[in-house]
From Swiss-Prot:
Role description: Catalyzes the ATP-dependent 2-thiolation of cytidine in position 32 of tRNA, to form 2-thiocytidine (s(2)C32). The sulfur atoms are provided by the cysteine/cysteine desulfurase (IscS) system.
EC number: 2.8.1.-
Entry keyword Lyase: no
Motif (PP-loop motif): 33-38
Gene: ttcA2
Protein name: tRNA-cytidine(32) 2-sulfurtransferase 2
Phylogenetic placement of the source organism: Bacteria, Pseudomonadati, Pseudomonadota, Gammaproteobacteria, Thiotrichales
């Protein structure tokens, strides 16, 4: 086991313990997009199950969105060799996105909603206890700033949440994992990564701008990324302006 994998194991098991993400006997569905993050999570979590660290029933779900150039042959071979239960479901969400999104606009929002809808549907149909997503620490940091800058809200990606209809529980075991470690792990393991040609062709994405902003700030102060992450668990409601968080009448007497 490499130092990188040991590091990933440490932060993943810490998040699972800190936020009580898994219970004994859980039937869980890990969403494998074909990218480095979900591949890394799968490899580590599968190893932890093999080592008897977790007693859970793991099922891998991949959504083929019918994007041009999609080839999952190597992904299938990888999953077969790993020996995990999996299903690759084909839904032409790509066609819907191309039809609905005006030229020049980004596809990410609609694409994500359609993908999320299929994930939730599949989880309910197969009576999954939990849905596992591969978002990492940098995703949380970027999402917080994006919400503030572009939506006027303070929110990010929680380690665990229940969907609005109460039907699905979603967990993110990699909320403490840095992207750079996942990049290194993907190189070490030579995962059969499937690039997202749809997203990759759109250069002016908001997330890329925010990511660059954080990187620039970190050059001046390396603690910036960790400070942003820590802010998500160090909230001072009395220092905000949401009237639902405090008694406005009491504060003006």
């Amino acid at each position: 086991m490499t130092k990188t994998e040991k590091k990933l194991r440490h932060y993943i098991t810490k998040a699972i313990a800190d936020y009580k993400l898994l219970d004994k006997g859980d039937k869980v569905m890990l969403c494998l997009s074909g990218g480095k993050d979900s591949f890394g999570l799968l490899k580590v979590l599968h190893g932890l199950i093999e080592d008897k660290t977790y007693d859970i029933d793991l099922h891998v779900y991949t959504l083929d969105q019918s994007q041009p150039g999609w080839d999952d042959s190597q992904l299938r071979k990888y999953l077969d060799d790993l020996g995990v239960s999996y299903e690759i479901e084909t839904k032409n969400t790509y066609g819907v996105v191309i039809d609905k999104v005006p030229e020049g606009k980004t596809y990410c929002s609609l694409c994500s909603r359609l993908r999320r809808g299929n994930i939730y549907r599949y989880a309910k149909e197969h009576k999954m206890d939990k849905i596992i997503l591969g978002h990492h620490r940098d995703d949380l940091i970027q999402s917080l700033l994006m919400s503030i800058l572009y939506q006027g809200q303070i929110k990010s990606m929680p380690p665990k949440f229940v969907t609005q209809d109460g039907e699905n529980t979603v967990i993110r075991p990699m909320v403490l994992v840095q992207e750079r470690d996942l990049i290194e792990f993907a190189k070490e393991e030579n995962f059969p990564i499937i690039p997202c040609n749809l997203c990759g062709s759109q250069e002016n994405l908001k997330r890329k701008k925010v990511k660059k902003l954080i990187q620039d700030l970190a050059l001046e102060n390396p603690k910036v990324p960790s400070n942003i992450l820590n802010s998500l668990s160090n909230v001072l409601p009395s220092h905000l302006m949401d009237r639902n968080l405090f008694d406005i009448d009491a504060t003006i007497k």
